[in-house]
Amino acid sequence: GMKMESNKKIQMTPKERATAMAKGEEVDRLPCNPNVANGVARVYGCKISDFNTSARILADAQIASYRKFGYDGVRVFTDLFPWPEAMGAKVICPEDNTVDLLEPAIADAKDIGKLEPLNPYTDGRLPIHLEAMKYLIEDVGDEVGVSAAIIGPFTFACFLLGVDKTLKACIQQPEVVHQLCEVGLQSAIAYVDAAIAIGLGPTISEPMSSCTVISPRIFRKFSQPYLKRLVDHIKSKGK
């Protein structure tokens, strides 16, 4: 039969695998991290809307999917809109589909002064996400890395004022976009700090900074400076 080296387990946990890879040691397989998101509802047998109100169901669905497929990271992520929603944006919550944006937080750039950074402990669905994070750390955190999604500052800006208005403002009212990115950055920092305090590492989604949406020039002017500050902040916390 096949001889196994005494120190090599037949199947490593994701954390063991990551540690071995970082040291350049032998691993049982390469890490694999699919973006399952709300697909976990199908595995667990709940409705996607259950994640809007129940931290326990959100955590248990994540765990069920992780146990079924054995991938290398569990991430608290339902949709792109819990953060703008926490700042006053309106969302559509289908019974069994992913939440979508209905109205941005402000209808006009002149209302920008009304925007305040979110409070992850009190606003919208964010307290549910934080509670789900705690369950995940308790239940599987010793064997698999648990991460928390956050949107980047420029994506925040687009969801706070609306995509079309924000992209127009990049040309016509650049100072407005900078203000939106700043309040987005402060919101992102508040949320990642709450997640890091629980023991998670943040992952940043910045879809509105894609080349399909903005040019590299616009990216360098508006998105990159705030994204860099967010990444630097996360690194300063040791993540």
Where does each model-flagged region fall?
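Short, basic/glycine-rich phosphate-binding loops at helix/coil junctions
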Residues: A105-E116
